[in-house]
Amino acid sequence: MEPWYKVTTPRAEVRGGRSFNPDEFAIALEQVVAGKAPLDYRDAKQFFDRTVFTRALTEHLGMVLRRLAGQTQNTSSVLSLITQFGGGKTHTLTALYHLVEHSKTSASHPDVQKLLKDCGLSQPPKSKPAVFVGNAWDPAEGKETP
């Protein structure tokens, strides 16, 4: 196996020795939806530029996109994303949010184009996402969404 430094180049922040803010690496989906997240997560193009389309991510996104397109074979109406901390659950949900909420921008990204082609789709299906983050609301105040 090749050493990591021969396979990939660390991001500029790492190469420059910049100290890290852990908040930059933990996506808060409610902040993405509210337009308050860091630009790398809020902007669909930048988000997908930084996303590695792993097999698990590709399978989950493909299943949901096919289901939204009305396909029921080899899809599920409910997905259970069970992973450890940092396993990609919120990243998957954020990717889905961008795919349906910012479909034109998302569909122009080369990795998304490949995903759509593999799903037999030319663009993300039209849908209206609803986002509820259970630990980001006050049960006494409630939450209204348009």
Where on the chain are the PLM-derived regions?
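Walker A/P-loop-proximal flanking segment of P-loop NTPase domains
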Residues: 1-87, 94, 99-100, 138, ...
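P-loop NTPase motor core
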Residues: 51-52, 79-84, 92-146
